[in-house]
Amino acid sequence: ALDAVPTTGGMVVIPAGTWMFGSKDQMTSTTEVLSIKSKTVLHLCAGATLKLVEYGKAPNNKTLFIGCKNKNQSDIVIEGEGETSIIDGQGTRWWKARDNKETFNPGAMIRFEKGSRFLIRNLKVQNSPGVNITLSNSNGANNGTVHDVTIYNPSSETKTEQPSHNTDGISIWGHHMNIYNCNISTGDDNVVCDDNAQYIHVWNCDFGTGHGASIGSFTKNIKHVWFDNITMNGTTAGIRMKTGINSGGTLRGGGEEDWKFTNFTMTK
């Protein structure tokens, strides 16, 4: 259905029910499983669950599950009708692969590269094999908005269920991105700004388990980042700034024009 959307644009509606996507060939490739073209709305009705097919062995290559990879696509919307509109990555097998020291190299559940004007709203993303939402990956995507989205992956430290690994809630690598009114619990960073994250505003969000509001470890050309009115309950850190030997860069020094963190509340 997504392939049939004309170049002039259109909407693909997922009705209530459970709908599987993905094939073995797709899961072991480096292409999209669900590829979204410009001027397309992917709408999940209330009660609709879009579920990634589960396999007995984790894929050997990074796979992009939903979005557009290495393509200059713009004006894309992924939306639902609230928390009963669900995208479920069934990530348990991937997380177990990590624990068993098997190949563990999952891609992002939702990822937009290049292009501009991306909107994700009013739904729930859960159990991603890897990062839940990636906005660009140093390829120039810009002008993205995520709002009223619930993201849930088990904590990497949980003792009551399978821990998830490298499951950042929202990973930002582009510029002019707005994140607001989101509830995010993960096994890694709740929201993280990496290379080329500029003019980023994250506000009115609740962070559960995870590593908090993070900068890095890819820190090249990060500036004009503002986290405001963030409530945290169960995070391992409030603000987490990190880098690595092979992933560092220039992180300009914390002035009002560079990055700021305001109105944080930690309840646990």
Task: Outline where the language-model segments fall.
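Extracellular/periplasmic carbohydrate-active domains that bind, remodel
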Residues: A1-K268
